[in-house]
UniProtKB/Swiss-Prot annotation:
Any GO MF annotation of the entry: proton-transporting ATP synthase activity, rotational mechanism
Keywords, sorted A to Z: ATP synthesis, Cell membrane, CF(1), Hydrogen ion transport, Ion transport, Membrane, Transport
Any Pfam family: OSCP
Domain of life, source organism: Bacteria
InterPro entries: ATP_synth_OSCP/delta_N_sf, ATPase_OSCP/d_CS, ATPase_OSCP/dsu
Species, as recorded: Bacillus licheniformis (strain ATCC 14580 / DSM 13 / JCM 2505 / CCUG 7422 / NBRC 12200 / NCIMB 9375 / NCTC 10341 / NRRL NRS-1264 / Gibson 46)
Protein family: Belongs to the ATPase delta chain family.
GO annotation, cellular component aspect: plasma membrane; proton-transporting ATP synthase complex
Lineage, highest ranks first: Bacteria, Bacillati, Bacillota, Bacilli, Bacillales
Protein name per Swiss-Prot or TrEMBL: ATP synthase subunit delta
Summary of subunit composition and partner proteins: F-type ATPases have 2 components, F(1) - the catalytic core - and F(0) - the membrane proton channel. F(1) has five subunits: alpha(3), beta(3), gamma(1), delta(1), epsilon(1). F(0) has three main subunits: a(1), b(2) and c(10-14). The alpha and beta chains form an alternating ring which encloses part of the gamma chain. F(1) is attached to F(0) by a central stalk formed by the gamma and epsilon chains, while a peripheral stalk is formed by the delta and b chains.
Record-linked PANTHER family: ATP SYNTHASE DELTA CHAIN
Mode of membrane association: Peripheral membrane protein
Role according to the record: F(1)F(0) ATP synthase produces ATP from ADP in the presence of a proton or sodium gradient. F-type ATPases consist of two structural domains, F(1) containing the extramembraneous catalytic core and F(0) containing the membrane proton channel, linked together by a central stalk and a peripheral stalk. During catalysis, ATP synthesis in the catalytic domain of F(1) is coupled via a rotary mechanism of the central stalk subunits to proton translocation. This protein is part of the stalk that links CF(0) to CF(1). It either transmits conformational changes from CF(0) to CF(1) or is implicated in proton conduction.
Length: 184
């Protein structure tokens, strides 16, 4: 079974528990933090994935590192240790977020801009692009990228809306290169 399919199964099981206990948002926040730590601390992954480190020691490391998370998240991590699948934690977190978003009718969006956007601008992007994405609402995160020169670039799931000056220049360059190839 592929890692993606396995991640979806664990995420679905955890999501069911979250629904029953009415902790969908809290568990999502916890998983986001856990994912960040797993990505940033490669040594943690190395220890948890090492076959010579006993499972009980791995669980103690998890308890010491993530003792403040909910029992459901901690026990999911323990289960992943028992089944030697701790490497799927970031994917599991991503799948859980997708399920939580579907449940709420929301989508995550990243708006790249040359300068930080105001709350009013972020709210405006959320309203306009929520309809475009077919969602009730968008959770917008703003990332500053001076390479855009001007305008904005918006990523919603795997869709990108590029209204940046850099994007327009790149499209003009490709168009001119295509015309030159036809002539040459």
């Amino acid at each position: 079974m592929s890692q993606s399919a396995v991640s979806k199964r664990y995420a679905a099981a955890l999501f069911d528990i979250a629904l029953e206990s009415k902790l969908v948002n809290e568990i999502e926040e916890e998983l986001t933090v856990v994912k960040k730590i797993f990505i940033e601390h490669k040594d943690l992954n190395a220890v948890l994935g090492h076959p010579k480190v006993p499972a009980e020691k791995k669980k103690q490391i998890l308890k010491d590192s993530f003792g403040s998370v909910s029992t459901a998240v901690l026990h999911t991590l323990y289960l992943l240790v028992d089944r030697s699948r701790t490497s799927i934690v970031p994917d599991l977190a991503d799948e859980y977020v997708k399920m939580a978003n579907r449940f709420r009718g929301t989508e995550d969006a990243i708006v790249y801009s040359v300068k930080p956007l105001s709350e009013e601008e972020i709210s405006s992007f959320s309203q306009v692009f929520a309809k475009e994405a077919g969602a009730a609402s968008l959770r917008v995160r703003n990332e500053v990228n001076p390479d855009l020169i001007g305008g904005v670039k918006i990523r919603i799931g795997n869709r990108i809306y590029d209204g940046s000056v850099r994007g327009k220049l790149d499209r003009i360059e490709r168009q001119l290169a295509g015309e030159n190839r036809k002539k040459g």
